Amino acid sequence: MRVLSFLCLLLVSYASAKQQFSELQYRNAFTNWMQAHQRTYSSEEFNARYQIFKSNMDYVHQWNSKGGETVLGLNVFADITNQEYRTTYLGTPFDGSALIGTEEEKIFSTPAPTVDWRAQGAVTPIKNQGQCGGCWSFSTTGSTEGAHFIASGTKKDLVSLSEQNLIDCSKSYGNNGCEGGLMTLAFEYIINNKGIDTESSYPYTAEDGKECKFKTSNIGAQIVSYQNVTSGSEASLQSASNNAPVSVAIDASNESFQLYESGIYYEPACSPTQLDHGVLVVGYGSGSSSSSGSSSGKSSSSSSTGGKTSSSSSSGKASSSSSGKASSSSSSGKTSSAASSTSGSQSGSQSGSQSGQSTGSQSGQTSASGQASASGSGSGSGSGSGSGSGSGAVEASSGNYWIVKNSWGTSWGMDGYIFMSKDRNNNCGIATMASFPTASSN
């Protein structure tokens, strides 16, 4: 009843908003989106979700029509409000303001102009954490997988590691399973435990409260130490990611992040200190935000149906994090395919900055970025804008970006990846809480 009452209130709010497209355009776009994302609703919920979708479609159009480096789209989160997204998929923000400027041990390396650890074979395929606030565990396994691969030298031994091992077994270190945790605490567990099991031997279930099933015989990697990056220093983060993939915490709370599709992500409203999501930096690059390139496998045709994707629960329970652990505790990408943490899409498929999506000409149809184009009208440029939130002055783009691996499956972003702005005052706090492990070569 509480959910239905909430949705009824949303109906009143969205029904009164000014519509940017015809009802036929909205309806066809929603129908196509529901088919693409295998979404079904009860009769009571359908109209509320439809109104939310319309509002998100308007937001995407407004943002993209301004032209810019960030392209939004009607992705897997297009039928939920930003408040639902925050409550259901992100943790309580961790305040990292006290960390800014904290000096850490210098990382002595001369960074290459560009780095992409996917191309080196050091990154496993995109995973999906499902209905569990365990992004901290995915960020941890990602950096540990990369460190192990690099330490293996000529063996080039890339092993997918078990997030469930961390969720079930690291609570005594201060982590809280599906309710939140920190990557650094997970590193401490792996060090003291003398290893972490492989994913194949300890598969992901997206469930909490299970008995620890770690077995020494199933260890896939070991680490001997970890190091924090100087907080707030993107130069230090670049030096670190020049050597290996790096675990980071970010502010992922804005609607622009929720509906991100491609391009270099820059959000003036992003906080550099209020961090609610753990992800993995797998490299960095530079390029014009208007250059064309692969759109991460998303069709630019007018149908917007794309490939079949996993259904996301729009009414899942929020994953609250325990105090001090929310920097990487967000419950992101909670799709119904939670029991499988690894998607079929291989990493390393993204290249270059993404361009806006082309629109079709069919009446009532939408482009891959969700722009209605009926009779050639209304789609806008589709090239994105860096200031959709309308807050703050927009800093000039450096054209530089971090290559970031998320854990929300391949139906979000560029096949599960996002290019985040680099060298723009630590946008979204990407360098505020960064750390990486050193693996044993054994």
From Swiss-Prot:
GO terms for molecular function: cysteine-type endopeptidase activity. One of its GO terms (cellular component) is lysosome. SMART domains: Inhibitor_I29, Pept_C1. Its main location: other. Its EC number is 3.4.22.-. It is found in: Lysosome. The keyword Transmembrane does not apply. The active site is at residues 135, 277, 406. Residues 18-111 form a propeptide. Belongs to the peptidase C1 family. This is Cysteine proteinase 4. It comes from Dictyostelium discoideum (Social amoeba).
